[in-house]
UniProtKB/Swiss-Prot annotation:
Keywords: Coiled coil, Nucleus, Ribonucleoprotein, Ribosome biogenesis, rRNA processing
Disulfide bonds, paired cysteine numbers: none
General function of this protein: Component of the 90S pre-ribosome involved in the maturation of rRNAs. Required for early cleavages of the pre-RNAs in the 40S ribosomal subunit maturation pathway.
The keyword Transcription regulation is annotated on this UniProt entry: no
Descriptive protein name: rRNA biogenesis protein rrp36
Chain segments carrying region Disordered: 1-207, 304-352
Comp. bias intervals (Basic and acidic residues): 28-39, 130-155, 304-315, 323-337
Compositionally skewed regions (Acidic residues) per UniProt: 16-27, 40-57, 67-86
Coiled coil: 221-280
Pfam families hit by this protein: RRP36
Keyword check for Transport: no
Lineage: Eukaryota, Fungi, Dikarya, Ascomycota, Pezizomycotina
Subcellular location: Nucleus, Nucleolus
Subunit structure and binding partners: Associates with 90S and pre-40S pre-ribosomal particles.
């Protein structure tokens, strides 16, 4: 049991970091030790068989046995006894003791690095895993180099000269940050578009805005009078045409503003009347005017504010407008027939 004592003496503690590293190599070395032990067992069996055959051969011969044969037989017996003792001691050692002894020697790579010198003549054997890793590394490096070359060689170009230019939308974020906000620069303010003015008037309260800017109506009416006077004095045809267009646009603008004001007045009166009826209990729900009813009431209010002469002119103008509209909607034969009735009752025939 001398070998087991020696192995147990050489056992030492290992750090926890090397357990995973030693596991693979320890398994590999255990396999190799098993193979070696198997080979040694087979060799010992072969030697025993040969020794038995030799003894049988010697026994078959009738000649005397010499002193040399006795000495050889004694030496063989001693060797056999020593090998038997070694095998018995090895078989009695537990696997845990063998693993500890193997781990105490350290990993195979570290032992080779410590014992082997760089000037050794024997080349180091490389595992197939290292070869595969080296090949993968080389393939990745080649692929990276090829991709870098392709990126450098490929220049951004348009498909045709008429195609729009392609530009990346990515922009680098500036490293500068505004720590202190600069003072705001005062800007010129137009009261017509000022939000403070529009919040008090404008869309929320059109009536107050109209009262606040009522002086603009006087300016527009005076401007229209000046344009008409200038149109009467000028004699140039081009200037007359330009003044005529300007007078027409100004008068249309004033007329549209007047119509809008009239609509608002009609709506205000209607709402006031409906509220009064609801307050008196004559109605439970208010009645909202339709666009057609609103248009009729606005037209009546417009004619009520006119004098007799203006009213007759406006009615004649409206009658002609409606007649021309109806004539356009009539078919061509009826339209020509109505025109023929004016010429002595003769009807014009359409030539095919």
């Amino acid at each position: 049991m001398a070998i087991s004592d020696l192995l147990n003496r050489r056992v030492r503690a290992l750090p926890e970091e090397d357990e995973e590293i030693y596991s693979e190599e320890s398994a590999f070395e255990e396999k190799s030790d098993d193979r070696r032990s198997g080979e040694s067992d087979s060799d010992s069996d072969d030697l025993d068989d040969e020794a038995l055959e030799e003894t049988d051969d010697n026994s078959e011969h009738d000649g005397p046995v010499g002193l040399e044969d006795d000495e050889d037989s004694e030496d063989g017996e001693d060797n056999d006894n020593g090998e038997d003792d070694v095998q018995a001691s090895l078989s009695s050692i537990s696997f845990g003791a063998l693993a500890k002894a193997q781990a105490s020697l350290g990993p195979k790579g570290k032992r080779n690095a410590k014992t082997a010198k760089p000037t050794e003549e024997s080349p180091q054997t490389t595992s197939p895993l290292d070869d595969i890793r080296a090949r993968i590394r080389e393939a990745r490096e080649q692929k990276r180099q090829e991709s870098g070359k392709s990126k450098d060689s490929a220049k951004p170009a348009r498909t045709s000269k008429h195609a729009p230019m392609v530009q990346s939308s990515k922009r680098a974020v500036s490293r500068k940050r505004t720590v202190v906000e600069p003072p705001s620069v005062p800007k010129s303010r137009d009261p017509r578009f000022d939000p403070t003015v529009l919040s008090h008037g404008g869309r929320h309260n059109a009536e107050s805005a109209r009262k606040a800017y009522s002086f603009l109506d006087d300016y527009r009416s005076s401007e229209l009078k000046e344009l008409k006077a200038k149109f009467a004095k000028t004699k140039n045809a081009e200037e007359k045409e330009a003044l005529k267009r300007e007078i027409r646009s100004t008068s249309d603008r004033l007329r549209a503003m007047e119509n809008r004001r009239r609509e608002e007045e009609v709506l205000a009166e209607h709402k006031k009347r409906e509220k009064q009826l609801i307050r008196e209990g004559k109605k439970s729900n208010p009645y909202f005017l339709k666009k057609s009813d609103l248009k009729k009431q606005v037209m009546l209010k417009k004619y009520e504010n006119m004098n007799s002469k203006e009213r007759t002119k406006a009615l004649e103008r409206r009658r002609k407008k409606i007649a021309s509209k109806e004539r356009k909607e009539m078919p061509m034969e009826r339209r020509l027939g109505s025109e023929g009735n004016d010429d002595g009752g003769r009807k014009r025939r359409r030539m095919a």
